[in-house]
UniProtKB/Swiss-Prot annotation:
GO terms for molecular function: small ribosomal subunit rRNA binding; structural constituent of ribosome. Keywords: Ribonucleoprotein, Ribosomal protein, RNA-binding, rRNA-binding. One of its GO terms (biological process) is translation. It comes from the Bacteria. It comes from Kosmotoga olearia (strain ATCC BAA-1733 / DSM 21960 / TBF 19.5.1). Coiled coil: none annotated. Belongs to the bacterial ribosomal protein bS20 family. HAMAP family: Ribosomal_bS20 (MF_00500). One of its GO terms (cellular component) is small ribosomal subunit. Binds directly to 16S ribosomal RNA. This is Small ribosomal subunit protein bS20. InterPro entries: Ribosomal_bS20 (IPR002583), Ribosomal_bS20_sf (IPR036510).
Amino acid sequence: MPNIKSAAKRVRQNKVRRLRNKSVRTRFRNVTKQLLKAIEINEEPEKVNELLRLSYSVLDKAAKKGVIHKRQASRRKSRLTAKVKAYLEARSAGSAQS
């Protein structure tokens, strides 16, 4: 327990910030998992693209709030985009051969 008034206040502030950051982090992790799951189960391309747009939005908001670094957000978006692009190309190649 802190002995100094300002240290006690910092503890309270850190608790609030930790909970806020945790909710933002949970949100972008869940959206990312939804996107990867949609790719895994061969979801419709429209649904996958919608989830990708949502992922972009959530990651950008997390970076804006300082929960993750902007380069980390950019890197995650890039990797998700590459996976979606590969999925869509494989899906279109599969339907073209049928």
